[in-house]
Amino acid sequence: MSTFERSLSGLPGLDSMLDSIRMGDNVVWQVSSMDDYMHFVTPLYAQLRKDGKELLYMHFSGHPALLQAGDGIRVCEFDPSEGFEAFTMNVRRRIKAEGRDAFYVFDCLSDLQAAWATDLMMGNFFKVTCPYLFELNAVAYFPLLRGQHSFDAVARIQETTQLLLDVYTDNESLYINPLKVWNRYSPNMFLPHKYMEESGAFLPLKGGYEISRFYTLVDTLTTTSENQNLDSWERFITDTRRTYHREGIFTPAVEDIISHTMMSGDEKILSLLKTYFEPDDYFLVYK
């Protein structure tokens, strides 16, 4: 397929709103839950089956797989606990082996932040992987959990991806607010859009009532705080220190995370740390 050729998403209304997903697009869906992500993955899979194409599911999260192998789905397993470099190279090798014009669905980028204890490495993975997928004319979907990452990490992802789409849902409605759509434009493209279930269209919000209802939902689902100026690891340490000094709580699980991340994976060293270190010693090492 040619570069920037239109590709169907399985949702005609979405294709109309965005002037189509294009070959080479990395699409980041900023969502509140993985259920929101599946609203877009399931139609993509159905469209690819109709077109006789395969979908590669890049599975690396601890949760059950979003898609099962078979019927046009190939599942590729990866382990983030191997570390940033090994994980990134394994993903890159899989992409290289697949070649051009492939279609990918990735697990949640936020799970990489949890595995590596830092937004920085999650962002670095995306900044390395996204351009390679673009180079190979692939289409790739990535979910990102809203409010879980530093503003800097989200900005790095937005800078790199071709599309960044904010998704909001409640019991009645589904909305998309495009934050970035690269290399295409329409007068209404960057307005919030509501999905009309009967027609399948995504219509821009223009009436006062609908706009007010949308921003009320945004306010409800958006958890923005001053801590989002910090990397996730900095937030974790700050919250842990605050909890310890206020409530005297420093659990073995928290100690394991800090010692493994900052110190060593060697069991003998970890045993010595647990014997001789107090919580404030860990905080001092972090400084």
Residue ranges and their predicted role:
Residues 8-53, 57-60:
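Glycine-rich P-loop/Walker A and Walker A-like loops and their local beta1-loop-alpha1 context
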Residues 115-116, 121-148:
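Substrate-engagement module of ASCE P-loop NTPases
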Residues 145-202:
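Phosphate-binding/switch region of NTP-binding enzymes
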Residues 35-38, 49-52, 259-286:
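Helix-loop-beta substructure at the N-terminus of cytosolic sensory domains
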Residues 2-4, 184-259, 263-267, 273:
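C-terminal regions of RecA-like/P-loop NTPase motor modules
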Residues 28, 103-107, 141:
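Structural motif
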Residues 37, 63-68, 149-151:
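Short, charged/polar "capping" segments at the starts of alpha-helices
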Residues 51-114:
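Conserved inter-motif catalytic segment of the P-loop NTP-binding fold
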